[in-house]
Amino acid sequence: MNQPIELTAGGRPRRFALHLPRAGSGGGIPLVIVLHGNHPDASGQMMRDWTTFDEQAGAFGFAVAYPDGIGGCWADGRGVTTADEAGVDDVAFLRALIDTVAGRHGTHLDRTVVAGMSNGAFMAHRIALEASEKVAVFAAVAGGLPASLCDTRPSHAVSAMLIHGTADPVSPIDGGYSRHLGPNGELRGRTLSLAETAGFWRTVDRCPPGPGDTSATEFSSRITAPGGVGGTRVAAWTVLGGGHTWPGARPFPGAAQTGPQEFDTAEEICLFAEPLLASADSRRLSRA
């Protein structure tokens, strides 16, 4: 079941496409929000064509929303996108999206999964921090935590899956300033490294100290820190030789590369998220 939906948020008309796993109501199921990267032609449809979230919706019983950023980008808090410069309130939009889908289809208000790539990954960090009572799990692909968000303190723990390629030329895995592709790469706001980003979220979620659980293949390695508040986890996944890509993406017209095919990122996000969809009450962070 597929529906185009329009709403008003932050004084602006906004839109998103909604995929439900079966005909009729999506009552009592989680919602996954998929955020595209920054490009004048970027849209939710691009991520729908590029990923397998529609198929995963059927397998996992999730509803999936594909929102459109204004001008093909998100106001992710770095202050450098056209949406940031125009004062777009994308946090308000995504909050309204969650509320709208819950009101119409009965999806959980406090167990949302947000997945994004690049500018969408930065936005995923932001919404996880600023709407942590609604977002239970987020996945950031090719996008570390924006340095501008480091002082944000969420009210609830949020599980994090962080996926980054070692050869990313746009948003370096070691952090620093993100750049557009091309010989005159434009500085696009400073971000933390994958290790620093994982450390930040481990601290937020109050995961116990320690090296975490490690798994590795010929093409990637993954370190998962369990034991956060409400059972939250933080997984840092390094893709060896991976560029600024969504691993396992489908090829589509205009795509320069689709990245490693060792795993399907959409499937892995759903596998990670499924056991971590804890209520807001169980994820609430006590204040010292």
Model regions: which residues?
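Serine-hydrolase catalytic machinery in alpha/beta-hydrolase-like enzymes
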Residues: 3-113, 117, 122-130, 246-258
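Short alpha-helix in the alpha/beta-hydrolase fold that links the catalytic acid
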Residues: 47, 173-182, 186-203, 212-225, ...
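Acidic catalytic loop of the alpha/beta-hydrolase fold
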Residues: 168-171, 244-246
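A domain-start/cap signature at the N-terminus of enzymes
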Residues: 1-31, 55-56, 109-149, 195-199, ...
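Flexible "cap/lid" loop of the alpha/beta hydrolase fold
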Residues: 144-160, 175-178
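Short beta-strand/loop motif that positions the catalytic acidic residue
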Residues: 162-164, 168
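Mobile gating loops/cap/lid regions near enzyme active sites that modulate substrate access
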Residues: 230-256, 260-263
